[in-house]
């Protein structure tokens, strides 16, 4: 066991080297973790209460996040909701539209302040990632969304001919860029969300043939990776009005991973926040369901899920009360199912809310 004299000498030596490091590299270059504000990771709401629960509070600030999935599964919708949540708190958001496909009307419908949203449509992948780096280093931007990694085309590929081979060029670009900007992201507290597409590996007989574009660097640098899939098509009669999305937290460095959340995405409106609230209210026992009827404090509020959603939309004070009770129940340790939600096809009121299953094996690029 070390004596008090030895401990005192060690402490002096430690203080000396810490002072030397701070003189060489600046104040804050090395800190005790217990004294650091980084111990508590701040979060941003994803716009879906079920997903916030699966993430352990929401999307982490000052981290790299990857959202990937098949086409039309809700990747851009989820990113736009995160932007809207940041803007509600007075934050500044930027959208790097490498796909040149951003719809301002849809973004506004989701609650995005398009008048103050910074948008860039870069010509090359190098230009896009340099813009991201400069926005992050400015410490003035709270969230940057890159849509998408697959559309970050290296300059050499654009300047070359159509049939030229550029093996691994995009992967090297992403690896170099992430090495450069990850440290700045942590210091600035800016959240950077990369949207990514899926591709199929050739010749894979066993295991999952799906992979994401841009190489492996993003998988390592990302603190959170979200796999989003379209599981059902929502219908009223023969009219399709939305989809059911399932998100698996494939990686999470700030909370337990592999949790699953489901929510509705309504065409032209985005994530159904009230739908998420009803699902969790039923799971926590705040709202009861008997057959097709939903009730609160032994009073029926709606027959079928859709009518209950309509009732809550028309009564914001009631919705706020339910929201407070659900959050209090969750904070008190209420247990919910693995998916955090009720399966829509378990709803006996099938005339009110029809669904059509989606075969995920058909979702290919």
Curated annotation (Swiss-Prot):
Biased composition (Acidic residues): 347-365
UniProt entry keywords in alphabetical sequence: ATP-binding, Cytoplasm, DNA damage, DNA recombination, DNA repair, DNA-binding, Nucleotide-binding, SOS response
Superkingdom assignment: Bacteria
Gene Ontology molecular function terms on file: ATP binding; ATP hydrolysis activity; ATP-dependent DNA damage sensor activity; damaged DNA binding; single-stranded DNA binding
Name of the coding gene: recA
Subcellular location per the Swiss-Prot or TrEMBL entry: Cytoplasm
Function (record text): Can catalyze the hydrolysis of ATP in the presence of single-stranded DNA, the ATP-dependent uptake of single-stranded DNA by duplex DNA, and the ATP-dependent hybridization of homologous single-stranded DNAs. It interacts with LexA causing its activation and leading to its autocatalytic cleavage.
Organism of derivation: Arthrospira platensis (Spirulina platensis)
Pfam families (UniProt xref): RecA, RecA_C
Protein name, entry field: Protein RecA
Gene Ontology CC terms: cytosol
Region (Disordered): 344-365
Family of the protein in this entry: Belongs to the RecA family.
CDD domains, per the entry: RecA
SUPFAM superfamilies, sorted: P-loop containing nucleoside triphosphate hydrolases, RecA protein, C-terminal domain
InterPro entries: AAA+_ATPase, DNA_recomb/repair_RecA, DNA_recomb/repair_RecA_CS, P-loop_NTPase, RecA-like_C, RecA-like_N, RecA_ATP-bd, RecA_C_sf
Sites where the protein binds ATP: 69-76
An individual GO BP term: DNA recombination
HAMAP family, per the entry: RecA (MF_00268)
């Amino acid at each position: 066991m070390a004596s008090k004299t030895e401990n005192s000498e060690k402490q002096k030596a430690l203080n000396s080297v810490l002072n030397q490091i701070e003189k060489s590299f600046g104040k804050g270059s090395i800190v005790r973790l217990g004294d650091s504000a980084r111990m508590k990771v701040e979060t941003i709401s994803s716009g879906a209460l079920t997903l916030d629960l699966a993430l352990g509070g929401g999307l982490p600030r000052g981290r790299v996040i990857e959202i990937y999935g098949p086409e039309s599964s809700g990747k851009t919708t989820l990113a736009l909701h995160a932007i809207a949540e940041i803007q509600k708190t007075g934050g500044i958001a930027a959208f790097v539209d490498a796909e040149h496909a951003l719809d301002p009307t849809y973004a506004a419908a989701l609650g995005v302040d398009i008048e103050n949203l910074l948008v860039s449509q870069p010509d090359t992948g190098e230009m896009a990632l340099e813009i991201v780096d400069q926005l992050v280093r400015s410490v003035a931007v709270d969230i940057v969304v890159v849509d998408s990694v697959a559309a970050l085309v290296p300059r050499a590929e654009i300047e070359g001919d159509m049939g030229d081979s550029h093996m691994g060029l995009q992967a090297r670009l992403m690896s170099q860029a992430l090495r450069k900007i990850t440290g700045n992201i942590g210091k600035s507290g800016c959240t950077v969300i990369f949207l990514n597409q899926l591709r199929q590996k050739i010749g894979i007989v066993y295991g999952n043939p799906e992979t994401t574009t841009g190489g492996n660097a993003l998988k390592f640098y990302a603190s959170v990776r979200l796999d989003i899939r379209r599981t059902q098509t929502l219908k009223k009669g023969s009219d399709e009005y939305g989809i059911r999305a399932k998100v698996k937290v494939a990686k999470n460095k700030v909370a337990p991973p592999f949790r699953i959340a489901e929510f509705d995405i309504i065409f032209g409106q985005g994530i159904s926040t009230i739908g998420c609230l009803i699902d969790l209210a039923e799971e926590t026992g705040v709202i009861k369901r008997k057959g097709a009827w939903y009730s609160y404090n032994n009073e029926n509020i709606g027959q079928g899920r859709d009518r209950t959603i309509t009732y809550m939309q028309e009564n914001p004070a009631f919705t706020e009360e339910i929201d407070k009770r659900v959050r209090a129940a969750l904070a008190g340790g209420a247990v919910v199912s693995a998916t955090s939600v009720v399966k829509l096809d378990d709803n006996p009121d099938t005339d009110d809310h029809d669904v059509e299953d989606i075969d995920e094996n058909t979702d290919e690029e």
